[in-house]
């Protein structure tokens, strides 16, 4: 079963071709790292997958239905999004922000109670932000806000979560905990697509990596098979060597 499919996507910005003939599908349990250098087209691709940009050619289907034919609410019931940054308009509490994840299902005016309230509480604890539940979102650090948005996505109960550079602003410990959480969610059958320019994040938790280079899909496969010294030289113009320890793969500068 395919959760989402991108079919021969092309996108132009003026005379510049940003994406060219990009095709792939997302299945239940996929934990996909979208890897590429700055300017490779990752953010543009995510915005097309979310229905925020219309491709010049090709289409995206969500559960077999063309994305452009679905309402924003229908999309939100199936797809959750965690942006790289979020500037709130009002000083809502952390609990209020997380509970907003239920809006696509419950609608406006619904107060989270019963099972919904339990979902919010579980997400707060899972992300290690239970102590922030009554704090205004506007007073949080960038890393704390990121964890709140991920908790909101979990509460949304969508089949697919798309994250734009999810470890941005997180300290080392919270980076590792977040990557482990994404791995657990995929093991439960959710689909994850997260963009990154850091190959170590793809190696740490993803079970599949899509490599985007100059607007084209360069590779699609298991991280340890796809990410090589030659690939990193092509993507980032750096010479590295591969080191293995305790069954894990690392790349260090030559």
Regions picked out by a protein language model, each given a short descriptive name:
Residues 35-37:
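The feature captures the beta-strand-to-loop junction immediately N-terminal to the Walker
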Residues 50:
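Helix-to-loop junction immediately C-terminal to a conserved catalytic motif
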Residues 58-66, 75:
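Conserved ABC transporter NBD signature motif
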Residues 99, 114-132:
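Conserved ABC ATPase "signature" region
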Residues 136-140, 144:
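Conserved ABC ATPase signature
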Residues 161-165:
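Catalytic Walker B motif of ABC-type/P-loop ATPase nucleotide-binding domains
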Residues 235-254:
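ABC ATPase nucleotide-binding domains
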């Amino acid at each position: 079963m395919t959760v989402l499919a991108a079919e021969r996507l092309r996108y132009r910005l003026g005379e510049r071709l940003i994406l060219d003939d990009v095709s792939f599908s997302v299945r239940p349990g996929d934990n996909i790292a979208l890897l590429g250098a700055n300017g490779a087209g990752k953010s543009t691709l995510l915005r097309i997958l979310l229905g925020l940009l219309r491709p010049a050619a090709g289409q995206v289907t969500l559960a077999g239905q063309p994305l452009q034919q679905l309402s924003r609410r229908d999309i939100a019931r199936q797809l959750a999004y965690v942006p790289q940054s979020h500037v709130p308009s009002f000083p809502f509490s952390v609990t209020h922000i997380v509970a907003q994840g239920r809006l696509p299902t419950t609608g406006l005016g619904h107060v989270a109670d019963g099972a919904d309230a339990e979902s919010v509480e579980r997400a707060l604890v899972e992300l290690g932000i239970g102590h922030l539940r009554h704090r205004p979102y506007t007073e949080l650090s960038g890393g704390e806000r990121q964890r709140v948005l991920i908790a909101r996505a979990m509460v949304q109960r969508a089949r697919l979560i798309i994250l734009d550079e999810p470890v941005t602003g997180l300290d080392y410990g919270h980076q590792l905990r977040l990557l482990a959480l994404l791995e657990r969610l995929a093991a439960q059958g959710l689909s994850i697509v997260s963009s990154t320019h850091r190959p170590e994040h793809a190696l740490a938790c993803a079970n599949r990596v899509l490599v985007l280079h100059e607007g084209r899909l360069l590779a699609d496969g298991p991280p340890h098979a796809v990410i090589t010294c030659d690939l990193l030289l092509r993507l980032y113009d750096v010479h590295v060597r591969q080191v293995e320890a305790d069954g894990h793969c690392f790349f260090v500068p030559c």
